[in-house]
């Protein structure tokens, strides 16, 4: 698999795609699942309620956001890989957090949800043909390819893991 080219995704997503130097994106997504599981083992239920500042997400909300992102990006990838050309609306992440119940869900359930969602996404990506990987569609009023969405998913996790390490777990 080659890296997505500029024009296959909105410029905004370059901040995620640039975090993924590898080209075997399915392996990256698979390795992240093990990395996430390892990190989650170090966080207690008590610690999962921590937010590093006022109006900042708790660890639980961060994990919930990652699950929401996995679902949104994979939904886009599924539709586009099936040659669905219907434009896909964007979503407002803060609104999703505000209307969630993440802080009242057990940390173990939140982490299991993310890991199972990632596993399902891996199965989807492994099933795609070369042609499907290159299909493009429209999401959030911008063009996006299936392969770009996979790289965005991996970069999105890397972006938030960096924040988790630096702002939540380093204190």
PLM region spans:
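Short, contiguous, helix-prone interaction/anchoring segments in small proteins
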Residues: 21-55
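Solvent-exposed interaction patches of small proteins and small membrane subunits
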Residues: 20-27, 83-86, 104-105, 109-112, ...
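Short, contiguous alpha-helical
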Residues: 1-15, 49-93, 122, 134-171
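Acidic/histidine-rich alpha-helical segments that form the ligand environment
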Residues: 28-39, 76, 97-134
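A short secondary-structure junction motif
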Residues: 39, 43-46, 84, 128-131, ...
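Alpha-helix N-cap/loop-to-helix boundary motif
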Residues: 21, 28, 54, 58, ...
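Alpha-helical initiation/capping and key positions within long helical/coiled-coil segments
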Residues: 24, 28-31, 61, 65, ...
